[in-house]
Amino acid sequence: MASGRRAPRTGLLELRAGTGAGAGGERWQRVLVSLAEDALTVSPADGEPGPEPGAVREPEPAQINGAAEPGAAPPQLPEALLLQRRRVTVRKADAGGLGISIKGGRENKMPILISKIFKGLAADQTEALFVGDAILSVNGEDLSSATHDEAVQALKKTGKEVVLEVKYMKEVSPYFKNSAGGTSVGWDSPPASPLQRQPSSPGPQTRNLSEAKHVPLKMAYVSRRCTPSDPEHRYLEICSADGQDTIFLRAKDEASARSWAGAIQAQINALLPWVKDELQALLAASSPAGSQDIKQIGWLTEQLPSGGTAPTLALLTEKELLLYGGLPQTREALSRPARTAPLIATRLVHSGPSKGSVPYDAELSFALRTGTRHGVDTHLFSVESPQELAAWTRQLVDGCHRAAEGVQEVSTACTWNGRPCNLSVHIDKGFTLWAAEPGAARAVLLRQPFEKLQMSSDDGASLLFLDFGGAEGEIQLDLHSCPKTMVFIIHSFLSAKVTRLGLLA
């Protein structure tokens, strides 16, 4: 696989750093974005995060526990505190991390020093840590000769309870009295689950970036259509395959956003053969009776009933459409999709704009309906480009036809005129009703080819109506469960037969 050492593209963009006060008070930080073969790196650039035009600038978080307002003297600590090592236990909340920034490191010939403590977060709540404290160890791990990066990693990999051994460094504390820099170690990753958001929300908020952030491009999700409230079309969202790393960027104009999205997607696409090979191997290992070929894989943006959206990883095999919240990395994860749609009972009902009221991005959307024993499941998805829409449309239609040709025949128990029967539907032989009374001979009660079928319908509960014309007219079959699966299979057989005859392009 690509090494990621070459950076084919770099440039300055803005990173969404949170929300500020006032209307439209989103805060953006200027960052340097580097696109390599297998990762996207976002690093701080010159300039502080700023609010949207017209918004009220938020004050900087106050440095507490002795780090006073700009120009103030460093904290006055008891003399005994200056002479001893201290052990402080920090209990992290679910969000916010430790709530400190650090400076120093072996490469700077300095100890690891607390340069900022954020008000209200875990470190602040101990009331026992101070700006100017040197961190000597973390949970027993010695940091006395650690580099800056080693210290950051040691702090990040801690659990809910962190034991810090510290010592106050009086001689260096004045250096931090006006400091707003340092490395924040409070970046907590979101949970690995589908990122759901409402139409008014542009996505998960990111805290101020003070160190490089790397997003792996292997099966990453990229979207320029993450929010309808983007009149200038400048927004860009990138999410790692497992949902752990998400960044939300803003380009200078629509052309720049389109260019960056295309370049990032091209790098992701270059890694697809490796992803497909890995998943194919997992699929073969989890299906000892014979594996299915993966026909298509990619991210879709699903329109949720609530009005929001969620990135959904779709994997199309010869028989099924499998939907996941993230990239499955194990056989167990691959065998447990969030949803499964058997292609033989699935129908593409529209691709592109539909009639009537349509949701955001309808021009790049498609809808699927699947017949199940509980009724009809309907899902609406959107993609990022006309090329993606065409590819998914073609693969889904072809997949439904392949599934129909592969299955050939389905059967189900039913009742006809009060008599127990079995209904068999064959793609070539048509419809056959067999007697199913206990002990009775397997007699054929009715046989009709597909060509005689004039109409089919159902009541959505248990009844299937088939009209073959002639003397029989319409027959009514009670399938004893929701008939939608059989209705959709009949449609797939018909569609496959029509396509086989070359009546559709």
Swiss-Prot record:
PROSITE patterns: PDZ (PS50106), PH_DOMAIN (PS50003)
Residue ranges, compositional bias (Low complexity): 9-18
Residue ranges of domain PDZ in the record: 87-170
Subcellular localization: Cell membrane, Sarcolemma; Cell junction; Cytoplasm, Cytoskeleton
Disordered: annotated segments: 1-24, 40-75, 183-212
Keyword Calcium: yes
UniProt family annotation: Belongs to the syntrophin family.
Name recorded for this polypeptide: Alpha-1-syntrophin
Organism taxonomic ancestry: Eukaryota, Metazoa, Chordata, Craniata, Vertebrata
